[in-house]
From Swiss-Prot:
PANTHER family: N-ACETYLGALACTOSAMINYLTRANSFERASE, POLYPEPTIDE N-ACETYLGALACTOSAMINYLTRANSFERASE 5. Residues 356-418 are annotated as: Catalytic subdomain B. This is Polypeptide N-acetylgalactosaminyltransferase 5. It catalyses: L-seryl-[protein] + UDP-N-acetyl-alpha-D-galactosamine = a 3-O-[N-acetyl-alpha-D-galactosaminyl]-L-seryl-[protein] + UDP + H(+); L-threonyl-[protein] + UDP-N-acetyl-alpha-D-galactosamine = a 3-O-[N-acetyl-alpha-D-galactosaminyl]-L-threonyl-[protein] + UDP + H(+). Pathway: Protein modification; protein glycosylation. Gene3D superfamilies: 2.80.10.50, Spore Coat Polysaccharide Biosynthesis Protein SpsA, Chain A (3.90.550.10). It comes from Drosophila melanogaster (Fruit fly). The keyword Cell division does not apply.
Length: 630
């Protein structure tokens, strides 16, 4: 073989190898491109050529979706469900420790998650009543009509009827919330709204606010549950109206008046979304309300989330933003109350006002919960009647049985708060509320049950009914004790846990007892004959040196003055008292004076006086309860 022949062969082989390399490289890039397209597109193998391009949507539909900006999407791989909900590796409340194993998975299979798009903002109809959440002004010549219509629903129905069903609202979110990133795929939700004789405009404004301000892909359906309404327009007229809505909406009806609890259970039975979102029938959802709720649940399906509940004025329908620094608690009589978030929880959140807030209890009207978890944890207590107490029962159950309850500051929903209910209840409101509270006490309060009965004389007479099924549920879920709840979830609770004495405080000379007399904040503490029935005569002398009854503490601002009942602030000062168990006197730290029995001038009011250590300044503290904290 000549050198030239050898050279030609080598060149031919090199060209052949080069072609192979080029072909293989091209094939690799084609495969890589296909993988990328399949990874980031929902169109492949689904709607194919019908998929819309960025920025395209049906302009004739006012509620059509717009594409999320790229910087507002979070890739699915960024969701780390192995960490705690705060992104921490540890903490006092870690899921799965000490609770029943098994049950639903903590996370969702990817196949059920949907890619979503931001809902467009509702544009202001300038000059129209109530736009941008502004108050409605009723003309002077319509005041009488306004007062008459107010009686129908205990809110200004005339003002509501003047406002568009699609009224605009300001974006009330914290600036940091508007920059939040959420997962690009989230679970769908079904909205369940129970109503009874609701006004047409408030009910449909609730529905339209859901439709207008929710990512359409995440909104599975809206379920309206009519709890035996008697108004004609809530019958066929409502069914025909909702049938034309751009989101699947239908009406279920109870056969007889069932109450909120059982009506919600009926609605939940028909839910087809992954998450149930319960709303009241007189709400308005704001921009970006839904995504933060679902984004939290997608991280952990055992998290139950609530929006911040803003106020819609019952007089003017003005939209008023609520504080993001309050959480849910309860008092000695198991009444739900809003209290300021303690510094402990603020520190856990690194003082980030946009971070999820762990709340001891929820108001109960508005929240989202994974559908399977709702049933796994026992849904609602079907032994409860109508309304009242179900929010505390579910709150205790969530925390004690391994779940987490949060308020999501980046989600805002307005609610029409009324001074009184326009509805009547079979047997009366008090009977129903006490029955429900008794069921809560019997199942969840453990040894604090007797304390609750001592504080609420009506509850002692109320029948809780058969609670064996609910106790069995608690055993099956291996739930924690109420003491664990107070020590770990709600150490700021007003329920007596950390105290020296709990019971009546009796004057040695007059044999009369300190008594709140049913008075309210900033009124004087009283004194009356000792009746031994608990209630207004139960006081706790705490290890913070407070003398408290429920959320009221004895407070003295000046020497020789009266002693008032002021909301406990846990900061000492005017509310700090020292009890000498041997001498039996109660000395006020700030003034150095002692608590003395009432005088003839005012036989019902104890006073502060210089300490004389006489019998009129001696007080007997005897604990009635045996389960004091160690």
């Amino acid at each position: 073989m000549t050198f030239s022949t050898f050279t030609r062969k080598m060149r031919g082989r090199m060209r052949s190898n080069t072609c192979r390399i080029v072909l293989l490289t091209s094939l690799v890039w084609v495969i890589f491109d296909f993988v990328l397209i399949a990874r980031y597109s929902d169109c492949i193998g689904k709607d194919g050529w019908r998929c819309k391009r960025s920025g395209e949507y049906d302009v004739e539909l006012p509620n059509a979706e717009r594409l999320v900006d790229d910087n507002q999407l979070v890739d699915d791989n960024e969701i780390n469900t192995e960490k705690s909900l705060d992104g921490e590796s540890g903490g006092a409340l870690i899921m799965g420790q000490g609770f029943a194993s098994g049950g639903i998975s903590m996370t969702y299979p990817s196949v059920v998650l949907k890619k979503w798009f931001l809902a467009p903002s509702v544009q202001e109809a300038k000059g129209k009543p109530g736009e941008m959440g502004k108050p409605v002004k009723i003309p002077a010549d319509m005041k009488d009509l306004m007062k008459e219509k107010f009686k129908e629903n205990q809110f200004n129905l005339l003002a509501s009827d003047m406002i568009s069903l699609n009224r605009s609202l300001t974006d009330v979110r914290h600036e940091g919330c508007r920059r939040k990133h959420y997962a690009s795929k989230l679970p769908t939700t079904s909205i369940v709204i129970v109503f009874h004789n609701e006004a047409w405009t408030t009910l449909l404004r609730t529905v339209w606010s859901v439709i207008n301000r929710s990512p359409r892909a995440l909104l599975k359906e809206i379920i309206l549950v009519d709890d035996a309404s008697e108004r004609d327009f809530l019958g066929k007229q409502l069914e025909e109206y909702v049938a034309k809505l751009p989101v699947k909406t239908f009406v279920l009806r109870t056969e007889k008046r069932s109450g909120l609890i059982r009506a919600r259970l009926l609605g939940a039975e028909h839910v087809s979304g992954e998450v149930i979102t319960f709303l009241d029938a007189h709400c308005e959802c704001t921009e970006g309300w839904l995504e933060p709720l679902l984004a939290r649940i997608v991280q952990n399906r055992r998290t139950v989330v609530c929006p911040i509940i803003d106020v819609i004025s019952d007089e003017t329908f003005e939209y008023i933003t609520a504080s993001d620094s309050t959480w849910g608690g309860f008092n000695w009589k198991l009444n739900f109350r809003w209290y300021r978030v303690p510094s402990r929880e603020m520190a856990r959140r690194n003082n980030d006002r946009t971070a999820p807030l762990r709340t001891p209890t929820m108001a109960g009207g508005l929240f989202s919960i994974d559908k399977d978890y709702f049933y796994e944890i026992g849904s609602y207590d079907e032994g409860m009647d109508i309304w009242g107490g179900e929010n505390l029962e579910m709150s205790f159950r969530i925390w004690q049985c391994g779940g987490i309850l949060e308020i999501i500051p980046c989600s805002h929903v307005g609610h029409v708060f009324r001074d009184k209910s326009p509805y009547t209840f079979p047997g009366g409101v008090a009977k129903i509320v006490l029955h429900n509270a008794a069921r809560v006490a019997e199942v969840w309060l453990d040894e604090w049950r007797d304390f609750y009965y001592s504080m609420s004389t009506g509850a002692r007479k109320a029948s809780a009914g058969d609670v064996s099924d609910r106790k069995a549920l608690r055993d099956r879920l291996k739930c924690k004790s109420f003491r664990w709840y107070l020590e770990n979830v709600y150490p700021e609770s007003l329920m007596p846990l950390d105290y020296y004495y709990l019971g009546e405080i009796r004057n040695a000379e007059t044999e009369t007892c300190l008594d709140t007399m049913g008075r309210k904040y900033n009124e004087k503490v009283g004194i009356s004959y000792c009746h031994g029935l608990g209630g207004n005569q139960v006081f706790a002398y705490t290890k913070r040196q407070q003398i408290m009854s429920d959320d009221l503490c004895l407070d003295a601002s000046s020497s020789n003055g009266p002693v008032n009942m002021v909301r406990c602030h846990n900061m000492g000062g005017n509310q700090e008292w020292v009890y000498d168990a041997e001498e039996k006197w109660i000395r006020h730290t700030n003034t150095g004076q002692c608590l003395q029995r009432a005088t003839r001038d005012d036989a019902n009011t104890p006073l502060l006086r210089p300490c004389s250590y006489g019998k009129g300044q001696q007080w007997l503290m005897e604990s009635k309860f045996k389960w004091q904290a160690h």
